């Protein structure tokens, strides 16, 4: 049945709906029967708070397994015809008990795969109205005996009197009602205040990974693709958008309500379903192929959306050519939201973003922020092909979505910025390093992995999935060549369009396309065999290089492990390939710039003939491989000498690899740290971003181990001596005058990072400069009640550091001013900078106050989405490590009370609070919290935090005193 033949009843508040609405509102925490639709906090506090049913109580995690949550496979959806009526306050009159609820009616066309007498759908925190449910097959009505809800399993079951037969076509009609909550899942509320002080609320959906079931009873698994026809009934004065283009213009007005209808989508997974109801405004453009492109935002932010529009149009045009597949929808909307749980979400045709991920104004956004927006736009638009057009079958292959999108975003952002080389190089800093760090610990997981618990679905959205996935794809592209890689990807997308795929499907297409690349055995490489080694087992190799004789080097491999005593999860412990890999080996010999490639096979060492085994030899030249290198003492000496004599023999990418791998080798006791510091002596001649940035990262990692101990001072002095030549070349004035020049991107960011590093190391010269800017431009120019974006005229790259060191050096008087600016500010990015500055305070009492206010859900001081960032702000403070750990132990119930319903937020707070652990006693406290803390066992972040903390404590035992003596002697 088509939508034209349907009877619409949602405009009428039926008695049964009124009863259900009253029940829902009464049941919602913070709502009462007497709710009005006036825009007060209490009136729309539809918050969800964790309870025993949600979490399994204190002693045990009895949440359902992933298998329990799976739907029976006896029914398959073909299409959904969905109508939703949203009751938003502040626009039209409606019964107060309807405030911040929505009525829903869905007609699901299905086909029976196996005979059955029941239909099971996913449903969570919405109430199905049995009296408004109907099942028909052709012109025959079938009796529904009962409707059973299974809240723990997030399912609703329709028991049918007569058996449904194989291949039978059926139409299930379901009426239901739900809450527009503040849980960031399903249809939720996003709030903001207009410039005249008027509070506003909008309704928007977020359904990935498993929250479409909060919005509509459906088959909420990626493999159940179907066409969606959406109609939204919304208050007069608002606009509605959905995945498809509108088919009735601005909608049909009936009294106080508007009915907006949208074009049926292509076949897609339920998690991509999206709607929004708001009074946002848009700017519009069009691609060369006629795709209408709109950017939506709060009206007062519309002037900041031009860069996103230009970037989006440029990117989608490029992708159509790059993938050789036209964008299949008639329009693409992108929306900047005040409240949003992720950075962005790739809903097909209606991408949602946090405001700080889409808005842009060069007065307030530094070059790095601008690049981040280009990357996120490119990432989400890549998803329109990777994820939307072709979708993984199940979340155990999420990397097919996210790894590919992370990989492709750097290609797309290269087109947006017109600087492909910059994006490829930045990949090393922001993606490859992140992946190597995440995959070095025992709490990692393979790219393709078995999901056993429901919580693991959300936990799969991590650095392994995103960063390692992208890094492995980058290595594969370098191995087979860009054209073959692009062609294989295009063929994969075409073959599985509007369908689902697994990793094996991807590699099978590569096998068809890639037939002439020599593999490790000298025969044509089979991509399936090669790639599976990197996707089905966790970890990565470190290649050890040793001199075998005067003309031969011996290369061997082993798994790189941050802590060899840590134990993997049982299901990852015995992989098929035994933690061995066939490794494409790029290398450089002596003082030659030529890069050669060979293979190190997984089952045998490589004896490599070289012209002079006594010459320096570098592995992973240009750093496209997902592995590390190590050398014997003599090998490192030769590399160090080459860097001192002529470091430009190696490209900046190769120098980046050498420095990173040296720090990594020292961290696992493979070499002495003195070797690393000797290597860094060449840095006084270094001017390139990639090597210096990774050097500063390594230095920072060491200094974190010293914390605020007295021994930290000589260490800081030593590190300042290494960076002093670059600091003397860096200038705040140069940054302020040139940051808008995109060609100076790396130069600007390098100078800024060096200056900030010097400040962090305790340089009074640096801190005084920032403090003077704070006094001159903030304290002297900002009047009471002004927002920072109204009164602070500091160059965008400097704003965050000026605020931070203003508070750090100025104390309470500066903190009070920043607090005032923070309260008045409406630009999300500026608010982030100001909140970070509050975390820079030297007073622990002030830091505690910041966290307590952040957790207070009766206050709007910190938006819920920003709570993890507030914890990270405090954790970044050198004095915050011990304090924030104690805060976690003592205030765990408060943390759960505040954000316990957002699993991913708690997963981010735990590592922030444990990043400063320095003793075994603290580890024991953490283990006790994991075992006995309310609901703590459900959070996988504890295992990771305990492992990293143990690594940190072990490092301190092994290296602290020795390095303290070294730094003291070196700085006498």
Curated annotation (Swiss-Prot):
Cystines in this chain: 759-766, 804-840
Record topological domains on the Extracellular side: 40-972
Enzyme's top EC category: hydrolase
Main subcellular localisation: membrane
Keywords (A to Z) from UniProt: Aminopeptidase, Disulfide bond, Glycoprotein, Hydrolase, Membrane, Metal-binding, Metalloprotease, Protease, Signal-anchor, Transmembrane, Transmembrane helix, Zinc
Protein's membrane topology: Single-pass type II membrane protein
Region described as Disordered: spans on this chain: 47-66
Site residues (Transition state stabilizer), renumbered to this chain: 466
Side Cytoplasmic, residues: 2-17
Binding site for Zn(2+): 379, 383, 402
Gene3D superfamilies cross-referenced by the UniProt entry: 1.25.50.20, 2.60.40.1910, Neutral Protease Domain 2, tricorn interacting facor f3 domain
Pfam families: ERAP1_C, Peptidase_M1, Peptidase_M1_N
SUPFAM superfamilies: Leukotriene A4 hydrolase N-terminal domain (SSF63737), Metalloproteases ('zincins'), catalytic domain (SSF55486)
Compositional bias annotation for Basic and acidic residues: 47-62
A GO term, aspect molecular function: metalloaminopeptidase activity
Glycan-carrying positions: 99, 227, 549, 858
Any one of the GO BP annotations: proteolysis
Enzyme Commission identifier(s): 3.4.11.2
Active site: 380 (proton acceptor)
Subcellular location: Membrane
TM region(s), chain numbering: 18-39
Catalytic activity: Release of an N-terminal amino acid, Xaa-|-Yaa- from a peptide, amide or arylamide. Xaa is preferably Ala, but may be most amino acids including Pro (slow action). When a terminal hydrophobic residue is followed by a prolyl residue, the two may be released as an intact Xaa-Pro dipeptide
Sequence similarity: Belongs to the peptidase M1 family.
Name assigned to this protein: Aminopeptidase N
Species classification: Eukaryota, Metazoa, Ecdysozoa, Nematoda, Chromadorea
